[in-house]
Structure formats: structure tokens, C-alpha cells
Amino acid sequence: MMVGPVKIRVEGVSKVFGREPKAALAKVRGGMDKAQLLEETGHVLGLYDITLDIRAGEIFVIMGLSGCGKSTLIRHFNRLIEPTDGRILFDGEDILTYDTARLQAFRRRKVAMVFQRFALLPHKTVIENVAYGLTLDGVERASAKARAADQIALVGLAGFEDSYPAQLSGGMQQRVGLARALATDADVLLMDEAFSALDPLIRHDMQLQLKDLQGRLGKTIVFITHDLDEALLLGDHIAILKDGTLRQSGTGADILAHPADEYVARFVRDVNRGRILLCGAFAEAGLVPAADAPVIPAETTLEAAFAIFAGGAPAVAIRGRDGTITGGLTPRRVMEALARE
């Protein structure tokens, strides 16, 4: 994964739903919790003091249980929802300062959204659906169709250009939605529970296809899910929300190895750590394996390393991304990492 500078910066974003959100937010800052706020004022705390950075070229997953605020947060990134307080910077510009015309251009050209329920136009063909945003933006019809055809092929639907949504499976419909988002050539894709409505096998195929597309295109993707396995599979970085607050943000390996609190620890307790944790995080810098010891990349999972140790190797050397040896790893160190609560 090659990531660039900060693409989206969220600074102290809070959102309160109700008639007097500013006054309600002041009560929260004074110590009132979410339940008290609802009971005493009728206001709903959606988000509270969220700060995070999303870098260019990464898949950033925002996850949590129903009602945690994840869908509310992602809708701030294209201003479908306005914050009660805070700033949202896109390439260093505060999008909250945009007037109507600039916001419209931003939504058409800089961000694209993929929804859980596909949101396809049933009376239009696949290619018409994919080209729809381009034609709204004034792209000439023939050019729009040519760009749409390229994206349809990219998501594996070549040959279905003239089909209607009702003639497609759920997974195929979601591919159309993804192609429509890609056709705009937006810098950022916002995907709100995009695969949640799909059957498990189709869902896994879509997850793998998304990782492949992101690797080839280098898009910045913000992905919402309630599924921890999906978050760990897709996310270069993961943010975990609870009751509108950010509990932890980091790589999947970081969160598994060092949960920030008991809530996060419970969330990740049943995960197969060996398939997620990477050897580089547990290499011992002072350990120098024998000259003939196996050399493995830092991105090797602990599960894969354990299989190497099963062959009799007493230690392995860990190679960083720059090709240098960063340390060594022993079977005991792997066992300690896998057993850690």
C-alpha cells in the first residue's frame, strides 16, 4: 500500500440532532452523557469531538455497532449532514466554507458515494446508470458512455451494458453502483455498508475485488461496516466508534495488539489474531538469527510464520519494506503474541 498526505482531516467534529444543538452540545461538554441528553432535552448526540486523519490512497474503515455514529460521520464528508461544531478539511480546504455552487462541484467531482441498497435507476440500463452522473455534469453523451463502458469492464460486467437492474443479481447490481462511482473519477469513494445486503460468498468476492481495484487505481476509500472481519480484511486503518465517540484508531494489527480500552478489547477478543497480526510488529531488534535462517517479509502474518517454525527453524530474520533486516523472531515470541489477551 502506498499512501500519501492527509486527504481528509476531521477536527473536533460533533453533531447533535434537535432544535437547539449548540445549547445541547454545551451540556455534553459540561458532563451530560448521551442518555441523559436525550431524556432531559430530547436531543440526540450523534457524534462527539471526533478527530482523525484519512490519508490519500488508503482504505480507511469506520466501524462500530448500530447507532454508534459511523453513517452520520461519513455523511459529513460530503456535507449531506452539517456538523454542530468542528472542521472537515479536504486537501487542506475547509469544505464547510463552500457556497452552494462550490459544494455542488465538490460532490460531483471530488467525492462519490456507494450505498448499501445500490440506488440504481430501475428504468435505465447498466450503461445509462453508470453514465448518469457524467451526463448530469455536462459530459457529452458519447464520451460519457465510453467512460462508463470502461468502468463496467473494470468491475467485471462487460456484456451487461444493456441489461436492466432487475435482470442482475445483488452482487452485480452493487458492481454497477461501484462502476458509477468510479466513472466520475472522484478522488474519494464513500462506501456506507456497501456490501452488507449481499450474501456471504458474494460479499467476500466484492471485498476482494474492492481491494484489487484500490490497489490498481489508488483511490482513497472510506468504508463503513459493523463487521469486524470485514474491517480487518479491507482496512489499512480502522476507527472504532461507540455512542458517537472515537474509541480507537489505528491499523488492524495495532488495535488487536494494543486495544485502547475494555470495549475495544471485547470487540476484538474472538478474532483469529494469527491471520491479522504481522511479524514486523513483534521483531526483536537485538536478535540476530543465524546466517542460514529463513528471511521473511515484515508483512508476513504470525500464522504463516508459525508454519515456518513447525519445520524446525529456531528463528527467522525479518526483512523490512526497504529490504534491510529489522530484527529476528522466535517461536516463543509468536506464541506470546498469539496468547496475549
Q: For the regions a protein language model found, what residue spans apply to each?
A:
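Conserved ABC ATPase "signature" region
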Residues: 13, 27-36, 91-94, 135, ...
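Short coil-to-helix segment of the ABC ATPase nucleotide-binding domain corresponding to the Q-loop/switch region
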Residues: 124-131
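Conserved ABC ATPase signature
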Residues: 164-168, 172
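A short, proline-enriched helix->beta-strand linker immediately N-terminal to the Walker B motif
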Residues: 183-187
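Conserved ABC ATPase "signature" C-loop
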Residues: 243-244
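ABC ATPase "signature
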Residues: 249-250, 258, 328
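The conserved cystathionine-beta-synthase
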Residues: 291-314, 318-322, 329-341
